[in-house]
């Protein structure tokens, strides 16, 4: 027997499918939505609809954008000879907030994880290698997460571009092992960029 009305149970179930949202958090969010004014709840629903209709990957770096290219790729002030490789679009925000980096990005779409069935062809590694070849990239900064899958991904990419005339670096230590870039504070991340090491 359901505890709540069918529509409430459905909302809780859908919210529970989001990453890091368990059943109790989903229930709290659902009841928060129910308590808000109708206009606020509908604004949230409209924002969800809009993002699903408008957002797509940048054709160049695979960051999120509403157009063909993201704002970073379109910015003529960016250093086009340097590409920072990240796992996911949400890794770009913390790096940008450091103010230490003015190059371009490449979003892989995850990290290698054979146990989870994520192989090199499942990521945008081939597209990265092609960019390095065709865009005259001088430096490739591998800013994958400091965990087992991130490190394996960085080492794989370093091997893939070893014959190309590009400097390959990784962020310096200071980031917690096993952590994710999205949770790193700007000072630590800025120092990791400033002290990056050759691979």
From Swiss-Prot:
One of its GO terms (molecular function) is DNA binding. Keywords: DNA damage, DNA recombination, DNA repair, Metal-binding, Zinc, Zinc-finger. Residues 81-176 form the Toprim domain. The keyword DNA repair applies. SMART domains: TOPRIM. A zinc finger (C4-type) spans 58-73. One of its GO terms (biological process) is DNA repair. It holds the Pfam family RecR_C. It comes from the Bacteria. Belongs to the RecR family. May play a role in DNA repair. It seems to be involved in an RecBC-independent recombinational process of DNA repair. It may act with RecF and RecO. This is Recombination protein RecR. The lineage of its organism: Bacteria, Bacillati, Actinomycetota, Rubrobacteria, Rubrobacterales. The gene is recR.
């Amino acid at each position: 027997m359901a505890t709540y009305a069918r529509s409430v149970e459905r909302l809780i179930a859908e919210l529970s499918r989001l990453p890091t949202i368990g059943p109790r958090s989903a229930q709290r969010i659902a009841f928060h939505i129910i308590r808000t004014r109708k206009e606020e709840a509908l604004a949230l629903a409209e924002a969800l609809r809009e993002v699903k209709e408008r957002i797509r990957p940048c054709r160049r770096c695979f960051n999120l954008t509403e157009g063909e290219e993201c704002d970073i790729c379109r910015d003529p002030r960016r250093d086009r000879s340097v590409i920072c490789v990240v796992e996911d679009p949400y890794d770009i925000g913390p790096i940008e907030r450091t103010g230490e980096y003015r190059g371009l990005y490449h979003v892989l779409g995850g990290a290698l994880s054979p146990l989870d069935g994520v192989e090199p062809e499942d990521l945008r590694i081939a597209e990265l290698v092609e960019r390095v070849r065709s865009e005259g990239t001088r430096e490739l900064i591998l800013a994958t997460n400091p965990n087992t899958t991130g490190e394996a991904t960085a080492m794989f990419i370093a091997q893939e571009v070893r014959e190309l005339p590009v400097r390959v670096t990784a962020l310096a230590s200071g980031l917690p092992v096993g952590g994710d870039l999205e949770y790193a504070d700007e000072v630590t991340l800025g120092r990791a960029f400033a002290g990056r090491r050759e691979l």
